[in-house]
Amino acid sequence: MIYKIINFILSKKDHEEKKDLLLKIMKFFNKTPLNFLIKNKFPNNNISCMGLNFKNILGLAAGLDKNGDYIKLFSDIGFGFIELGTVTLKPQHGEKKPRLFCFPNVYGIINRMGFNNNGIENLIENIKNEKNVKSILGINIGKNKDTLIEKAKDDYLICINKAYYYSDYISINISSPNTKDLRKLQFGELFSDLLKSIKEEQNKLNKIYNKYVPILIKISPDINNSEIIQISDCLLSYNIDGVIATNTTVNKDIIMRCCNNCEKGGLSGAPLNENSTRIIKKLSKELKGKIPIIGSGGIISVKSAKEKIKAGASLIQIYSGLVFFGLKIIKKLIKSF
């Protein structure tokens, strides 16, 4: 109810401004005696995946809490895991506003945020300052806009080094459509070299901290079956711990079919569901259960969530579903598994 009231009050705001204000207001309420309006308590399902113990199957996808400003809030409202970021080595402003567009008639969102964030150091400080967080914390990392694609590996390795001790898992974002050439890192020598270097860094940090932090790769939905096979082979070859499927789509057919006023950027939400589920199904076939899949992209109902699990996902994440349906979707999804 409180989500609906605040959402209505802010209905005339720019979508990004509305989102930010909504989160700030909810964070404030969560620190008052009225926090019972926000907090959710669910029985722990104790799902084991990647050597981690998740209290439930549902996670928050990267993008909603880029800087770790709302960790306690998202933990208290029930998420089993929270993926922070995408964060980059250096702070950056991202693309010019407006850059976030909602299409409620199809439950779709187009964004061209461009990895706006306050940098990895700021995120780590925010994590250090949090207390009594009962959700698994993931950190999603990307490269800075001004880092050449040939040098992108260095950004990822430095960020892994900084994030390792403070995260339960790390995800590597090489699939956002809003950073030039980023998706090239999913293929060929750039991909294999990145994975090799990541595993070497992970092994080194494991010895230093005596702590194994799983590393996952987040992939694009705009890939064909041949590319899925190539990506899967590489993930298996380098013993990558997990894969997140998928990021947003730039498939013009899907976008034009759903959003007549076509904005530049990546499309998420319900229009992405069918394609992301297709990717998960094919990935699952190729990975043969050796690498877990986190299903993300278009989950706006129990039905779409169960489709992801049936296709082969071990865990699921939402973003657009939360934007359109508020806290009630968290309850529905968690109670359904």
Curated annotation (Swiss-Prot):
Q: Where in the cell is it found?
A: Cell membrane
EC class, as a word, reads: oxidoreductase
**Tagged with keyword Transcription:** no
Q: What is its EC number?
A: 1.3.5.2
Q: Which InterPro entries match?
A: Aldolase_TIM, DHO_dehydrogenase, Dihydroorotate_DH_1_2, Dihydroorotate_DH_2, Dihydroorotate_DH_cat, Dihydroorotate_DH_CS
Name the catalysed reactions. Answer: (S)-dihydroorotate + a quinone = orotate + a quinol
Question: Which free-text remark accompanies the cofactor?
Answer: Binds 1 FMN per subunit.
Q: Which residues form the active site?
A: S176 (nucleophile)
Q: Locate the residues binding FMN.
A: A62, G63, L64, D65, K66, T86, N140, N173, K218, T246, G269, G298, Y319, S320
Give binding positions for substrate.
K66, N111, R112, M113, G114, F115, N173, N178, N247, T248
Q: Give the pathway annotation.
A: Pyrimidine metabolism; UMP biosynthesis via de novo pathway; orotate from (S)-dihydroorotate (quinone route): step 1/1
List, in alphabetical order, the GO biological process terms annotated in this UniProt record. 'de novo' pyrimidine nucleobase biosynthetic process; 'de novo' UMP biosynthetic process
Keywords assigned by UniProt, alphabetized: Cell membrane, Flavoprotein, FMN, Membrane, Oxidoreductase, Pyrimidine biosynthesis
Membrane topology listed for this record: Peripheral membrane protein
| HAMAP family noted in UniProt | DHO_dh_type2
Q: What does this protein do?
A: Catalyzes the conversion of dihydroorotate to orotate with quinone as electron acceptor.
Please state what the protein is called: Dihydroorotate dehydrogenase (quinone)
> Source species, please?
Wigglesworthia glossinidia brevipalpis
Classification lineage: Bacteria, Pseudomonadati, Pseudomonadota, Gammaproteobacteria, Enterobacterales
